[in-house]
Amino acid sequence: MALASNPRRRLHEVRVQKYVVIAVTWRGAQPMSQRARPSRVVRAAAWGMFARCHPGAAAGWHRCTDLVTRSSARPAYTVASQSFSQGLVEDAPLQNPNTLTYNRVYSKVGNTRILQAEPAVLNFGGYELGKVYSQVLRIRNVRASGTRFHIIPPSTPFFKATCPAKKGLLAPGMTEEVAVEFCPTQYRYYYDCVRVHCEEENLLIPLHAYPVANEALFPTRVDFGRVALGQEVVRSHTLECKVPVDFEYEIVEVKPNPAFRVEPARGVVPGRGRVTVDMWFCPLALTTEEAVIETEVAGVYVPDTMLLSAAEVGLRTKDVRGAIEARKAAAAEQQAALEKGALFRLQLALAEEAARKVALGTAPHSGQQLLTAEQPELEAGGAVHQPSAPVGSSSSGGGGGSDPAFKPEHKRTRVLDKFMRAVWRVVTHQRLQRRLERIKEVLAHLGYDKQRLAEEAANPVLLVSESDRPGTAPTKYLRPEMVRVRPLPLYRDVLFQVHHATDLSHYTDFDELAPFTSKVRERLVPSGLVPPLSDYPTMPDACKNMPYITLEIGNRYGDDRVYGAPDPSYSPYGSLDVDYAVQPRQYDVYDSARHEAVASGGVRSLRGGPGLSDSWLVRQICPAVPTDEQLAKCGGTGIVNTIPN
């Protein structure tokens, strides 16, 4: 084309949304009259390209040609003007920032002045694919007044935090239970966090998940007992791995002893398998032998130092500047303390040197002998200065100790040395006491729990950063040459509970503003063990109209012996016994053998016996030889009641 063959013109294609604008930039030294309008070739090429890209957009051609005409009169100027681009470019949708995480710092791990997390760090160690592991996180209010807070769940799809019945205002001393679940998809290291937004300080609870071998159940002490010389005794212990990942182990002899040996000293624990380690003892002498061994199992190591970039994490310049200034202030304070200590030691040395210094001169004798230049150096080493005897003194006089001018410098040096040692001992004791008090405060805060203390000390990477920690693995922001590693705790069954995967519809999210509606409907379902009542056969009449068998069941009335009623007892006051005046109501004899039927409930032990009820009547006394009418009136049981004369 003529447009492409002209070396003084360049064609720029600017694609904006759905339109293609042909921009022509004139770069030449032609006069303004010659550069006033583009040629027909340029306008034809622009129209052809525009029509090919958008055939139905011919209505906007005049606007484009006017734009090309106006912009072509300016050298080195892009055609797409601001008004035209604003009309064509689609506005980006606005995103509402989360006020709980935007420009918020979550750096306090474990506890703050208001809230305390139990445990401070959640570890899911030694997991299996396809299972869901859950732990309970308790957030306690340790302040004297109530508080409100927001719980921000983990951001990765592998962790889930639910709180079905969250309290609005948490009273002092009360706890909020949060169920944290973890569902892995592969064997690797997972990291996330649960963030708690509170009034003054925000709380961070890290979540770690990693494949690791089980906690070694090696005993802390193995006693072989009394063993004869030359005899070998073996003790076997097991290293187990519940996850399908192999782990290397090595047993190191911290305090070796030739009487002990461990086989195998190193090896691999297979996935979902176990390895037996034998410890042999063969005494070589009649003494108590002792050895110390240490078992090291290769696990997952996490970085101890993190390098965060502002672009990926979203660090604020103010936070970075504040951290740098705080670090500089701490370094300056440490340097000032070192300079102060050095200055004190220098002043002390100068004072001691000034005390030993002697100015030699020709002053008149003041009753004490002047020292020479070599004598102060000897005094510093503890030498004894013995003054010379004065002129005219007799040798038979008292010793040097009786001379008032005599000063034993070795005693002074010894006392000064003891005093300095005592002062140093007192100062060291005070410092150790302060450190011990701080350690006791930390242990009391952790409840003297070894597991919590290990969790606090196992991951110092989470205790130093002041940034808003994202929900991604920290290894993403690391440089290998600037990282040192530290192992995580081993697998323990008591740390979490295992249950099968649950449908996602049963979860309740924290951002659900609507009232909670049950997703499960209720209906009566037969158990399958007992058939319904409609399937049973009809009940016979013998079961519908059964006599009351409530007082006695047995063969008391089954034999031919006659039982006489108990004699009445009279009180000293001449009244009749009330218990003798009543008797139970007696029914006719019910013979179950005669009316036996299916499901009638008949009992053969009641054959020939009367059916007794729980109702009572007034006793009717019969004569010694009753008649048939009297017998029928008494009940027809054959029991004779007599009254003594």
From Swiss-Prot:
The gene name reads: CFAP221
According to its UniProt entry, the function of this protein is described as: May play a role in cilium morphogenesis.
Where does this chain mainly localize?
A: cytoplasm
The UniProt similarity line reads: Belongs to the PCDP1 family.
Q: What is the native source organism of this protein?
A: Chlamydomonas reinhardtii (Chlamydomonas smithii)
Q: Where is this region: Interaction with calmodulin?
A: 428-435
**A Gene Ontology molecular-function term?**
calmodulin binding
Annotated protein name in UniProt: Cilia- and flagella-associated protein 221 homolog
What are its GO biological-process terms? cilium assembly; cilium movement
